[in-house]
């Protein structure tokens, strides 16, 4: 009720609430109240694809069954677009935004004032992305009721906040121009190395600017969640692999019997080193028509460690996060079977089926890419063990996947997280970066919570 009332009082708000604190339910309660006050009002909800087709429909059926909705996704979205006038809620995945934008430009979608909800608003944190720029052009379509929702609003620091708040107030609080915002609050350098660091004392100015429309609810005050137990498993590279890893790091290349792998930049090198640690590296060749990517397999160290952890789990379901597709093939070879996997190329219907089976306890090992499962998916009833075969650079993806298990509805008394890391390598660097980013985001949470929001 606190979040619902905050929306009704302020109109445009940011629900900066921990995953599982009921953001979706609060928004639906607010929509029901506003529908009574403003008959005919419609709401557009933008969300990641899986929450669009699973979470929002389930939550509407549970908490607001009188609200009629449609989902503009899939092959029939053009037809359903013409039938939206009678719907209370129109749900659109971010992946369909370009299509929706073109429909609006062509006036094939009714142009009027809609309440708008940005679910997982950190997906519009980049001020220069095509997604954000399209939203900026569509802002005149949206009423004064605008809601941003995120449990991970600033995964890369406070600089991530500008475009999310711009969608709410057209630049009133954090300036109407990103360059002005960056110059006012941050030190910015580049090229060749681009760095953005907060100016001394600027954090408090940002916190004060956004405080009045931000609702921050700390999980400790509202939820009795199981603790997260973290175990880091450090692997030492054997001498030959250590020699090859160091050579790749120093020389930006690595030789194989049939090819030579090159890293053209520091960023490319970082990616090649991370591939190496996961068991293989990609090389690219041009066959005259297109670029072909070839996988060169190196080792199975992490897959073998996962096998050991599965034995320790003693039959309890395990959720395992990977970063590269070749990891799945290595895992299948080591485990001697093909566990279900959800990543970019997995059809949504298959992914939904796997998640349902997981929640019923029918899948002993589910392999996922955090970008495919992390946002707004309910899989907490299926298990309490998470293994990171590879950590992502993104704090958002990292925390979102963790919060799929550490949330309301988790049946176990604790969630166990294993991180498989290779010592004295990029793995350790990534873990340190995630820790620093988390500290910055936690400072934001603490400041807003202490302010009473």
Predicted regions, residues:
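Conserved helicase ATPase motor motifs in RecA-like P-loop NTPase domains
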Residues: 19-20, 142-158, 166
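Conserved helicase motor
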Residues: 50, 71-79, 93-99, 125-130, ...
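Inter-lobe coupling linker of SF2 helicases/translocases
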Residues: 91-97, 104-105, 109-110, 129-144, ...
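SF2 helicase motor core recognition
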Residues: 98-101, 156-158, 326-332, 351-355, ...
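Walker B catalytic acidic pair
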Residues: 119-120
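A conserved SF2-helicase RecA2
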Residues: 393-453
């Amino acid at each position: 009720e606190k979040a619902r009332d905050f929306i009704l009082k302020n109109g445009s708000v940011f629900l900066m609430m921990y995953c599982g604190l009921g953001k979706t339910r609060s928004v639906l309660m607010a929509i029901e109240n506003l529908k009574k006050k403003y008959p005919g009002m419609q709401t557009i909800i933008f969300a990641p694809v899986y929450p669009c087709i699973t979470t929002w429909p389930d939550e509407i059926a549970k908490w607001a069954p009188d609200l009629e909705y449609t989902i503009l996704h899939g092959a029939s979205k053009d037809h359903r677009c013409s039938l939206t006038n009678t719907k209370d809620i129109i749900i659109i995945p971010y992946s369909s935004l370009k299509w929706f934008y073109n429909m609006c430009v062509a006036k094939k979608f009714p142009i009027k004032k809609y309440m708008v909800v940005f679910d997982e608003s950190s997906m519009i944190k980049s001020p220069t992305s095509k997604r954000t720029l399209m939203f900026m052009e569509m802002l005149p379509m949206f009423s004064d009721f605008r809601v941003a929702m995120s449990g991970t609003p600033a995964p890369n620091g406070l600089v991530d906040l500008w475009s999310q708040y711009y969608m709410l107030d057209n630049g009133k609080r954090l300036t109407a121009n990103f360059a002005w915002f960056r110059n006012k609050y941050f030190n910015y350098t580049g090229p060749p190395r681009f760095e953005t660091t907060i100016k001394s004392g600027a954090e408090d100015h940002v916190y004060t600017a956004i405080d009045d429309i931000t609702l921050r609810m700390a999980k400790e005050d509202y939820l009795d969640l199981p603790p997260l137990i973290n175990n880091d498993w450090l692997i030492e590279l054997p001498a030959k692999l250590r020699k090859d890893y160091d050579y790749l790091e120093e020389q930006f290349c690595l030789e194989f019997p049939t090819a030579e792998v090159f890293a053209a930049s520091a960023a490319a090198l970082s990616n090649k080193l991370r591939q190496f640690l996961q068991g293989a590296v990609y090389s690219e060749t041009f066959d005259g028509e297109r670029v072909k990517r070839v996988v060169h397999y190196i080792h199975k160290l992490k897959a073998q460690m996962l096998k050991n952890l599965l034995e320790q789990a003693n039959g309890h379901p395990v959720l395992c996060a990977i970063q590269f597709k070749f990891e799945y093939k290595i895992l299948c070879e080591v485990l001697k079977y093909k566990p279900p996997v959800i990543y970019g190329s997995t059809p949504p219907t298959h992914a939904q089926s796997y998640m349902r089976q997981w929640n019923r306890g029918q899948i002993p090992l589910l392999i996922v890419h955090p970008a495919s499962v992390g946002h707004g998916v309910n899989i907490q009833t299926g298990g309490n063990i998470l293994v990171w075969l590879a950590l992502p650079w993104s704090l958002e993806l990292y925390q979102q996947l963790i919060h799929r298990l550490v949330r309301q509805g988790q049946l176990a008394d604790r969630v166990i997280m294993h991180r498989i890391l290779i010592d004295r390598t990029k793995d350790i660097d990534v873990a340190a970066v995630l820790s620093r980013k988390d500290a910055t985001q936690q400072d934001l949470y603490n400041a807003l919570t202490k302010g009473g929001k």
